[in-house]
Structure formats: structure tokens, C-alpha cells
């Protein structure tokens, strides 16, 4: 029999999704959000949800939204932040540093030293309880980032005004500061009034608050998550698309849900 060729006859695209693709997606989400793989019962439950129509955006969104309600989500995110910006400092190290500062306070009559180390303890206690405060909704993710850079551990890693300012831009904005930004940031760090990112400030706290309310910071959050989940930089269109609602809503977790519920993260077209 002869084969019959029909001109312009193109078969429809194959829209099926292999089971292994669904299972891999589920495990990727668990690892990214909870820091561990799904156990068999969890895998089966998620598979049943997604198997019926893995191309359904709403089904993937529901799956990811359930994951970010898990207590391990907050612990994993805190561990990621501490690993990225604080050399992986843990709760025991924080508690030990607080104890050292408390001992210094009880060993001196110098009022300046007492006030200095009392302030250091406050900053470390904010870091110590940040995870629970964030989980309880008492602070935003931006507050969490400010606490992360406002303690003696971060200061020791990024010692001095120049290193500190550069670290903010490189860690959270994915670029080096301009000469003007660097000089203004250094002035604020050293307690001298200056105009930084078009806003007036006079000290290190102002430096932090101005930076973490800037467009550069929110665009950097988008870049951070794209590199974490997609291993690539976002396009300029994607930066604008995702940073705008982030600036308006201040909802970091919502952005994570959008990215992990995407077809790109699942690995389908």
C-alpha cells in the first residue's frame, strides 16, 4: 500500500504530561519550600490533585498554596536567608552571642558600653525571634530582611561602611552601587546626613529603611527567586511584571506561589 501524504496536515500537539514529570514537579516544590522531599502519602495526595489536569494553572496554584501553609515553610525560608546572608548562623550561635554581651554588661560600669551592648542584644533578639514573628504575621518579609542585615553577625561579615553598603546592593539588588550611591550610603552608615536613593537620611537605620523600601530592592527579590527556582535572570518584562504587585502588596509568599505554580517550573509548555 502506498502512503498518502496530505499537504499541510500537521498533527495536533501532544498535550499529555508524563507521570514522572508530575512527580518530579511535586518533589521540586517540596524541596524548594519545605527543604525536604514529599513522603509517599504526600506524594500520592498531590499526584491525585494534579494528575487529572496537570496543565490546570489553578490546580498547581492550590497545591503550592497548601505547601506554604506548612510550618516547615517558614523554617526553610529562614534557613535559606541565614545561609545566603549570615554564613548559616544558627539559633545556638545567636543565643551564645547574646550571652557574651550580657556577661560584658554585668562586668562593666561604663555606661557607654552598657548602652552599646544592650542595643546589640536587642538587635540579636530581633534576629533570634524573627522566624516566629514572621510565621505569626507580626513582621513582613521585608522586615525580616532588615533584621537579617541589622545585627552583629552581618556587621562582622561585611565590616566597615563601604563593605556594608556594597553588600546591600550585591545581595539584594544584584548590582554594584554607583559612586554616588556608595558615597551617600557610607555617609549614612557613619551617621552623617545624606541623600540616598533620592531620600534624605541621617544614620544607619535610615540607610536600611530607604534601601529596603526602594524599587531596586523589590526588583532584586524577583531576581533572587528567579535564580533560585529557574536558574536564570528574569527578563526586564518579568522584573516589571512581578515587582509591581510585590511593591503594592508586599506579599513575598504570593510571588513564590506564582513562580512555583508556573508551567516553566513544572517543565511543561
Residue ranges and their predicted role:
Residues 1-269:
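Composition-driven recognition of low-complexity segments enriched
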Amino acid at each position: 500500500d502506498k502512503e498518502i501524504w496530505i499537504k499541510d496536515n500537521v498533527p495536533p500537539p501532544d498535550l499529555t504530561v508524563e507521570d514522572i514529570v508530575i512527580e518530579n514537579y511535586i518533589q521540586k516544590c517540596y524541596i524548594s519550600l519545605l527543604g525536604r522531599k514529599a513522603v509517599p502519602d504526600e506524594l500520592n495526595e498531590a499526584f491525585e490533585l494534579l494528575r487529572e489536569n496537570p496543565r490546570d494553572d489553578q490546580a498547581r496554584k492550590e497545591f503550592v498554596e497548601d505547601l506554604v501553609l506548612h510550618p516547615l515553610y517558614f523554617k526553610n525560608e529562614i534557613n535559606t536567608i541565614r545561609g545566603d546572608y549570615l554564613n548559616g548562623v544558627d539559633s545556638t550561635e545567636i543565643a551564645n552571642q547574646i550571652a557574651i554581651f550580657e556577661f560584658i554588661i554585668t562586668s562593666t560600669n561604663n555606661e557607654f558600653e552598657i548602652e552599646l551592648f544592650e542595643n546589640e542584644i536587642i538587635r540579636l533578639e530581633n534576629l533570634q525571634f524573627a522566624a516566629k514573628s514572621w510565621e505569626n504575621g507580626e513582621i513582613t518579609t521585608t522586615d525580616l530582611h532588615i533584621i537579617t542585615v541589622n545585627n552583629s553577625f552581618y556587621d562582622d561579615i561585611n565590616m566597615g561602611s563601604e563593605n556594608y553598603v556594597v553588600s546591600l546592593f550585591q545581595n539584594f539588588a544584584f548590582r554594584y552601587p554607583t559612586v554616588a550611591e556608595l558615597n551617600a550610603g557610607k555617609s549614612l552608615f557613619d551617621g552623617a546626613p545624606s541623600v540616598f536613593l533620592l531620600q534624605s537620611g541621617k544614620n544607619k537605620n535610615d540607610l536600611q529603611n530607604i534601601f529596603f523600601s526602594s524599587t531596586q530592592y523589590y526588583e532584586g527579590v524577583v531576581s533572587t527567586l528567579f535564580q533560585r527556582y529557574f536558574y536564570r535572570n528574569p527578563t526586564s518584562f518579568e522584573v516589571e511584571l512581578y515587582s509591581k504587585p510585590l511593591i503594592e502588596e508586599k506579599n513575598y509568599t504570593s510571588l513564590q506561589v506564582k513562580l512555583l505554580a508556573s508551567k516553566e517550573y513544572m517543565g511543561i509548555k
